[in-house]
Structures are given as structure tokens and as C-alpha cells.
């Protein structure tokens, strides 16, 4: 079990500093691959459409996911509902490279997340704070991402979640060892993971940014805040020029510390996706999960 988990963590490390793009068909997947995406997330509706159309959002049609797998050479991920381990079994059976237990879909279980250690395929999960991140890692997640607020084109929640996780890790490093068990109890997180963060000052897995990233500057901002890579959902294919924006976000993620490059790749991209103000949302996806 431990060897398998270490392998999954190492596989996740291979996509560090890359961009993962949401796609709804093979054509979009090819655009993402040509733009330099390190992986694609296959789903039937991007988060902005899920938010707009409402209803129950479930995992995507396996046939559509397999078509995307066959269309590209890069890894293909797909989403399942929180707690829906049968959807995860189906995705593992059709050969996805990673499963996202995602708050963007309608939760199937309001008590438990999936026990990810039951699967060979690696999982990524969202987190708003250190406690959520460590609980998901304790369940077997090989990768963490900020929850942000998907489908809004508004990066503020992703920034909040990344800053929260970073500040809580710094605080943990300053906590006396005899108090760590109390912290573990308060966070509901495994003690060995609390010890790891207190000693190393970082998560034991990679942490990507997700939720509301719409521009090259957004991607560079999250990288400068300490993220290991970027998920882009609605921000590319809901923009005026998906191909140009996809390439620009990939370049911004690579050269996130170079303002000259960032300025150049931000030119002439056309309109970004229309954004939403968080305070006016009827449903906040980030509140899902625990």
C-alpha cells in the first residue's frame, strides 16, 4: 500500500510546474496539448456551465472520456463526485491517469470522502485550508489543489486558500512539539502529517492552484504565491481566443517570475471569460467537502 502511494506521489511530481486544462471534447484536448498543457481534465460541462445550468452534476460519460484519451498523448484526468467511489471505480476501469474528487460536481456523500487508498490510480482533491489538505492526503490523495471558486473567472478565492494553507504551515513550524497532537485533534488531521508539515514547512504532496484562473497574470500570481502548477477550467475555452490564451497561460506558468515575458504573453489575447462576483453567488462550490 505504501509503495503504491509513493509511486502515485512520484507520478504527480512529474506534472509539477505544468498547466492542466479542462476540455469537453477531443478537439479541445488537442488544442490544449498543442498549447503545452501537461494534462487535460475531461468533463462534459466546464464549471461555468455547471454553475449556469444548475441541476445535479455527475461524472462524465465514459465514452466521451475514452475519446479524449485516444485523441492525445498527455495524461487525461476526470472528475467524480465527492464520496462516489463507484464513479471512481468506473474511471479507473477505463484508464484515466488521475481522478479529481471534485466539489464542482454535486456531492454524493455528505459524510465521507472516497478512501483513495483502495485505488491504484492517483487522486487529486481540493482544499481551502491546511486541515482539509491533510485530511485528503490522509485518505490517500497524491495531489492537492486550491478549491478556489470554479466557473467564476475570479481568482480571489484561490488566492485566499493558498495564503491560508501557507500561513497555517508557517504557524505549525513555530508550534512546540508537545502541542502538535492538540493541533492534529483540532484539525482532524493525521498526526504523522502534522509532524511532517511542522518539520518540513510544506505539504508531502504537490499543491496546484485551481478555481477562477482566467489570465496569464492570474497563473503567475498563484505560482508566485507558492503553487506547484495550475488548473484552468472555464478560463480558456470561454475566452475569445482559446488557442492564444492557452499558450499564454502555459508560458506565464513557466516564466512566472519574469514581468517582461508576462507582459508580452498578455498582449492581444482578446476578451477573457466574463467574471462573477463571489459575494453574489447562489452556490459556492468551495463550501462542499469537509
From Swiss-Prot:
Active site, per annotation: 79 (schiff-base intermediate with d-ribose 5-phosphate)
Binding site for D-glyceraldehyde 3-phosphate: 163
GO annotation, biological process: amino acid metabolic process; pyridoxal phosphate biosynthetic process; pyridoxine biosynthetic process
Pathway per the UniProt entry: Cofactor biosynthesis; pyridoxal 5'-phosphate biosynthesis
Keyword terms, alphabetized: Lyase, Pyridoxal phosphate, Schiff base
InterPro entries for this protein: Aldolase_TIM, PdxS/SNZ, PdxS/SNZ_N, RibuloseP-bd_barrel
Quaternary organization: In the presence of PdxT, forms a dodecamer of heterodimers.
Family recorded in the similarity comment: Belongs to the PdxS/SNZ family.
Function: Catalyzes the formation of pyridoxal 5'-phosphate from ribose 5-phosphate (RBP), glyceraldehyde 3-phosphate (G3P) and ammonia. The ammonia is provided by the PdxT subunit. Can also use ribulose 5-phosphate and dihydroxyacetone phosphate as substrates, resulting from enzyme-catalyzed isomerization of RBP and G3P, respectively.
Xref: NCBIfam families: PRK04180.1 (NF003215), pyridoxal 5'-phosphate synthase lyase subunit PdxS (TIGR00343)
Protein name per the record: Pyridoxal 5'-phosphate synthase subunit PdxS
Species the sequence originates in: Clostridium botulinum (strain Langeland / NCTC 10281 / Type F)
Gene this protein is translated from: pdxS
Amino acid at each position: 500500500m505504501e509503495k503504491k502511494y509513493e509511486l502515485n506521489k512520484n507520478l504527480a511530481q512529474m506534472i509539477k510546474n505544468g498547466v492542466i486544462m479542462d476540455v469537453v471534447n477531443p478537439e479541445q484536448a488537442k488544442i490544449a496539448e498543442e498549447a503545452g498543457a501537461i494534462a487535460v481534465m475531461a468533463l462534459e460541462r466546464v464549471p461555468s456551465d455547471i454553475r449556469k445550468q444548475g441541476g445535479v452534476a455527475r461524472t462524465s460519460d465514459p465514452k466521451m472520456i475514452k475519446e479524449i484519451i485516444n485523441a492525445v498523448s498527455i495524461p487525461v484526468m476526470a472528475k467524480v463526485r465527492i464520496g462516489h467511489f463507484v464513479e471512481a471505480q468506473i474511471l479507473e476501469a477505463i484508464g484515466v491517469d488521475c481522478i479529481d474528487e471534485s466539489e464542482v460536481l454535486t456531492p454524493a456523500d455528505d459524510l465521507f470522502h472516497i478512501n483513495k487508498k483502495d485505488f491504484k490510480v492517483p487522486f487529486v482533491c481540493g482544499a481551502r485550508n491546511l486541515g482539509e489538505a491533510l485530511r485528503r492526503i490522509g485518505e490517500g490523495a497524491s495531489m492537492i489543489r486550491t478549491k478556489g471558486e470554479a466557473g467564476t473567472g475570479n481568482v480571489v478565492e484561490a488566492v485566499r486558500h493558498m495564503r491560508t494553507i501557507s500561513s497555517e504551515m508557517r504557524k505549525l513550524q513555530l508550534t512546540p512539539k508537545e502541542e502538535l497532537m492538540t493541533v492534529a485533534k483540532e484539525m482532524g488531521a493525521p498526526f504523522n502529517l502534522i509532524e511532517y508539515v511542522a518539520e518540513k514547512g510544506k505539504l508531502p504532496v504537490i499543491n496546484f492552484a485551481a478555481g477562477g484562473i482566467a489570465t496569464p497574470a492570474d497563473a503567475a500570481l498563484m505560482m508566485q504565491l507558492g503553487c506547484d502548477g495550475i488548473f484552468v477550467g472555464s478560463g480558456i475555452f470561454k475566452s475569445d481566443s482559446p488557442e492564444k490564451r492557452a499558450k499564454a497561460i502555459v508560458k506565464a506558468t513557466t516564466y512566472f517570475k519574469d514581468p517582461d515575458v508576462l507582459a508580452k504573453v498578455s498582449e492581444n489575447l482578446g476578451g477573457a471569460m466574463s467574471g462573477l462576483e463571489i459575494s453574489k453567488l447562489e452556490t459556492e462550490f468551495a463550501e462542499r467537502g469537509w
